[in-house]
Amino acid sequence: MREFCTKWWKRIATVDMLFIGVLTLLASLFASWLKQFPGFSLFGALIIALLIGMIIQFPIRSAYVGSNDGRKAGVKDAAGLISNKLLRLGIILLGFKLNLAVLFTQGIKCLPIAAVVVTLTIIVCYAIARKLGVDPMLAILTAGGTGICGAAAVMGLAGSIKVPEDKQDEKDNDVTMAVAIVAIMGTVFALLEIALGPLTGMTKDQLGITAGASLHEIAHAVAGGDAFGAVDIATIMKLSRVLMLVFAAIIIAIWWEKKHSEVQSTGKKTVAFPWFMLGFIGASIIGTFVPFVTSITPQLVDFAYIVLGMAMAALGINVNFKAIASKGKKPMLASFLTSILLMCFAAGVAMLFF
């Protein structure tokens, strides 16, 4: 235990960790401030934080790292540690946003729809991506982000998948690429649904369900629902999909371990069970049924987004632009085609059941 603590203290207590920690915190806070303005609100704080991280990597390299190899390794390790560990903490804290009492009362019809939507979307998007030649990691992350809840889903699923140490950089690039793809697709389809919604003849509740069942980020679903005067039903539908992240993360972790894992096993076969998802459920239960916690839920959720924003900014700092440029077109096409099918399916379900 002492050796473990010493090892982690040496890794954390560095100038590079302090520098990157402060930068990612500032990036996250700035993103949270920016999201309140028109235009930025459609992207949400997490996507903005990722973009800030991608931008500031250039002055970090030129002004701070320079030709110092030790500093370069320190920055990379610090950003990697922040993106990995704060991701899990942020997902756990995000559980406070999920009010189970509301979901199992007002949203009782939304839960089975969410289960079907998430399952079909992940399967279809993954199949299309693989058919186009996308590697399994990027394909499943893009599928999960498209089907569940955008950036948070990509990061949640990434935390459930183990890769060898020498493949961690490639995995981080895939995470960044998948986040960027679902952010772009979510924005495009949010604008498309807002424009086409009034022309369909659907009721406002049907339009709200369609937005919640088909749009990628929570911010997209809220924007779509608000445009139709159905923000409450859109949010409930979207949060029903968010709940599916728990089951998707567990199932995908088991599937990945059996089909694609490259981690060397030492004896007994184990599965990379996403234990932090139990924390997510625990936070949901506490946030729903403990009165004191319920009263401070907005503050806890704000803190969750700050933590996740730090993780996203750290991802942006380590991103490899050449890798993204060479691999991004096919998964984006897969997400685009799936998003069209998802929008049509969600509209059909909304008209049938609401």
UniProtKB/Swiss-Prot annotation:
Belongs to the UPF0324 family. GO terms for cellular component: plasma membrane. The chain crosses the membrane at residues 12-33, 43-65, 86-108, 112-129, 138-160, 175-197, 239-256, 271-293, 300-321, 331-353. The keyword Cell membrane applies. The keyword Lipid metabolism does not apply. It is found in: Cell membrane. It comes from Bifidobacterium longum (strain NCC 2705). This is UPF0324 membrane protein BL1094. It is a multi-pass membrane protein. Keywords: Cell membrane, Membrane, Transmembrane, Transmembrane helix. It comes from the Bacteria. It holds the Pfam family Cons_hypoth698.
